[in-house]
């Protein structure tokens, strides 16, 4: 066999040696952050959450303090049922100052799905403080409150929203869920209720709404109005309730909250229930267009305490010991 030139041997070996080095060099080339962010955003829009998660993770390796990206990664992980990982990203995003309603909503959802119910309730309330009309958050929150045996708080939350819809000419949204909660409450042991001694109310549209039961009627949301003397009812509710009452004055002129003057009746209602607390002999006014509200003569039966934390306001009603 003829001898091979050593220079040819070296020439053959060098490409084989250099090729892996060249490939390694290519593999270490980073995709620009802007491109990763664009791809991740497109994947989110296309609901390809595996793609979104991968690209957000690569993006955050280069931009670790981007709070919006941290929140987006958490949402992608939430969508993939990776809730423990999502909670970590959401907490980082919030600690970095991110504060959007979708971040709060998905954070609450992941907290609930990892068994952190009390924290989830807090963050659902924060979500509603930003967007009160978010029905998914309201419905999910009500379910968690039922798990904690806070039935009336859940009913007030849903009834208040349905009352708002009715006032603007729309159909109630939570009728079915309210029926389910009322049924669960009737079947539960009252001694186990978290609301044996007090009821907590959430502020909606500038008002605290209390769950009130009148006779045979369903639980309704009443505005808590410390500036009004008497409780006001609608004629429709009074008729549905079939409650015992006495007419005190058959015809009076009353001024409504929006300034209208209407004809009304002053009555004395035998019994009403605010949450699970029964009140006897309650003075009230009723008319065809009266707004449902609890006046001072009913509220004076309770000790009221308000609280506000991180943008969320609550009012607690605790029956006075007479």
Task: Identify the role of each PLM range.
Residues 1-2, 132:
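A general, composition-driven signal for non-globular sequence regions
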Residues 23-322:
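Pepsin/retropepsin-fold aspartyl endopeptidases
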Residues 13-22:
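Bacterial N-terminal signal peptides
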Residues 2-14:
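Bacterial N-terminal signal peptides that target proteins for export
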């Amino acid at each position: 066999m003829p001898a091979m030139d050593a220079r040819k041997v070296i020439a053959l070996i060098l490409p084989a040696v250099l090729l892996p080095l060249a490939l390694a060099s290519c593999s270490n080339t980073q995709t620009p952050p802007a491109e990763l962010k664009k791809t991740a955003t497109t994947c989110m829009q296309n609901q390809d959450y595996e793609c979104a998660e991968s690209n957000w993770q690569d993006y955050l390796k280069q931009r670790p303090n981007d709070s919006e990206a941290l929140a987006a990664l958490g949402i992608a992980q939430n969508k993939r049922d990776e809730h423990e990982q999502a909670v970590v990203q959401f907490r980082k995003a919030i600690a970095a100052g991110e504060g959007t309603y979708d971040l709060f909503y998905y954070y609450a959802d992941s907290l609930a799905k990892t068994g952190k119910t009390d924290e989830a309730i807090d963050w659902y309330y924060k979500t509603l403080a930003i967007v009160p009309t978010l029905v998914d958050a309201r419905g999910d929150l009500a379910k968690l409150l039922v798990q904690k045996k806070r039935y009336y708080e859940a009913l007030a939350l849903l009834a208040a929203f349905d009352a708002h819809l009715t006032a603007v000419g729309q159909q109630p949204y939570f009728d079915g869920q309210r029926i389910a909660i009322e049924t669960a409450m009737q079947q539960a042991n009252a001694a186990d209720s978290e609301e044996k001694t007090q009821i907590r109310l959430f502020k909606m549209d500038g008002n605290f709404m209390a769950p009130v039961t009148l006779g045979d009627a369903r639980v309704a949301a009443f505005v808590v109005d410390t500036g009004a003397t008497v409780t006001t009812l609608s004629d429709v509710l009074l008729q549905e309730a079939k409650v015992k009452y006495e007419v005190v004055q058959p015809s009076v002129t009353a001024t409504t909250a929006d300034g209208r003057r209407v004809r009304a009746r002053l009555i004395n209602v035998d019994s009403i229930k605010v949450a699970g607390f029964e009140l006897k002999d309650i003075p009230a006014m009723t008319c065809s267009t009266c707004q449902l509200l609890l006046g001072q003569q009913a509220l004076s039966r309770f000790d009221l305490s308000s609280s506000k934390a991180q943008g969320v306001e609550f009012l607690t009603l605790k029956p006075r010991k007479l």
